[in-house]
């Protein structure tokens, strides 16, 4: 599945969670990279929500951390046909349903010179 979406600013909460060893170690082990402490937030058209929710609900990749932190489902993905990473689906989130959170080893706004409003493609 390949979806075009719009880059937007998040709430900055992912930086804290992606700095926790149990998340970092699991992503490194299962995805092959140590994630940059933050996500690239992408708003996708609502017409894709049924397919995204199906992928999320059927996803078997899950990190269940220590008490006090929420579980995270993830699926390997690519951004703009060039960056390998993953889309994360945190059990606890404040984002709307049509937000995808993409993680990678690099700060993608810098690496790809992205700004709010830019269009990106996400494939998973």
From Swiss-Prot:
Domain of life, per lineage: Archaea
Keywords: Flavoprotein, FMN, Kinase, Magnesium, Metal-binding, Nucleotide-binding, Transferase
Cofactor binding notes: Binds 1 Mg(2+) ion per subunit.
An example Gene Ontology biological process: riboflavin biosynthetic process
EC number(s) reported in the record: 2.7.1.161
Cofactors, names only: Mg(2+)
Gene Ontology MF terms in the entry: magnesium ion binding; nucleotide binding; riboflavin kinase activity
Binding positions (CDP): 10-15, 106-109
Reaction equation(s) it catalyzes: riboflavin + CTP = CDP + FMN + H(+)
Keyword Nucleus: no
Protein name: Riboflavin kinase
Organism: Methanobrevibacter smithii (strain ATCC 35061 / DSM 861 / OCM 144 / PS)
